[in-house]
Amino acid sequence: MHSIKPSDKLQNNQPETLLDSVMDSPAQRSIRAQDLTDEAFAPYGDIIKPRISGEQFDRAYSYDPSKENTHVKLVMTNGEPTLRIMHQRLRGLTFSKMARHRRVSQRLGSLQGKEWFMAVATPTNNDSQPRLEDIAAFLIPGDRIIKLHVGTWHAGPHFKHEECLFLNLENEDTNTRDFQEMTLPQVCQIEI
């Protein structure tokens, strides 16, 4: 077995081994989940909220989309939109990778009214990646859908349930032709 002698150390105060480097940093980075509000989520996307709908032929009800605050603008360019239901099993609240899409504003929402979590970081230019301290996490109520801005880095959906169904609106080829992934330098844990 080879042991490292003081003379074998790397210059410039670098760690002696990869193991020393890992041990010098915390094992996980905690990110406290915050409540989902328009103001807090604005840098990352929009919130689609339920609204009361009138009867189709009710003359007392007039629908004016320009006066509604429950609508969000969708970006579905350079591809064919697809709506799908994702059935996901328990994934826990830790993650070590984030992804983004540069051509589409992705929408996600729980179909069963279950709360869930999403970690996000603001869109970055070109190939630059977000810093760990710029990652935020949100608790998404089961009656909300989120729309991520084009290019928003994200990890999730995450949840504590055994399984969950999600509605996902994106381009058909989003996860093949419009998918950029990054590995984080540290495992992140969403804290409740």
State what each model feature region is:
Residues 114-116, 136, 142-144, 162-165:
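A short pocket-lining beta-strand/turn micro-motif at the edge of beta-sheets
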Residues 152-179:
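A short beta-strand-loop micro-motif that forms or neighbors metal/cofactor-
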